[in-house]
Amino acid sequence: MVYRVTEIFKSVEGEGKRIGTPCVFIRLAGCNLRCSYCDTHYSQHDSDGKEMTLQEIVAETRRLNAKCVTITGGEPMLQDAISIAKALGWFECNIETNGSIPLPEKPENVFYTMDWKCGCSGMTDAMHAQNLQWLDENDVIKFVVGNDADLEQAKAVINTGIKAIPYISPIYGMIEPKEIVEYVLDNELDARVQVQLHKVIWDPDERGV
């Protein structure tokens, strides 16, 4: 099996429940959405990646030698991300997905981090609502927000009784993190506020971090 891969690198997890943990990132090329705030434009098209076999991906991941893996994109579910995770069965694998594609059953070593696209993304209508029912307590659902309307959307989804752990992140330059904190506290919302650690440590536009 051949994949289109933008990059494979080792860094620390920049967000979610493993934040700060050393991790190998496998970034697959190609995405079916065009979010307004996308920070990985260089991975939107299939042509942005190079061809790698499953065996080559596994070998490079082992060479980089971290205890966990994040498979991201682009949109990794456009390629067979599950087969990569199965081939890396001795690693805990986080598959980051944009929420528009029906999620397949996951192997034991996988958890999903699924976006729920709010209004500022321009991609809300692309969401596959049934995915909300498939996520479990080990999964993460991420809301990237830019204004009060986005926060209201996030609250509405969270209050449906989802099982996944909800995280709310700011769109940089549109909303201050403290505004999100105030909203979560004022609304007694069962959610975690986060900023992207890698954008604090490095330049927000730097790749391979």
Regions found by a protein language model. Give the residues of each.
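Short, functional N-terminal and low-complexity linear motifs
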Residues: 3, 23-29, 119-124, 151
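Short secondary-structure boundary/capping segments within folded domains
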Residues: 14-18, 30, 185
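Conserved Radical SAM active-site core
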Residues: 3, 7-10, 22-23, 29, ...
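Short linear functional motifs in flexible/disordered or boundary regions
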Residues: 17, 47-50, 69, 153, ...
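Conserved AdoMet/S-adenosylmethionine-binding subsite of the radical SAM
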Residues: 77-209
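Short N-terminal binding/cap micro-motifs at the start of the first secondary-structure element
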Residues: 12-17, 34, 202
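A generic, residue-level signal for flexible/boundary positions that often mark functional hotspots
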Residues: 6, 12-13, 126-129
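A generic structural micro-feature
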Residues: 18-20, 135
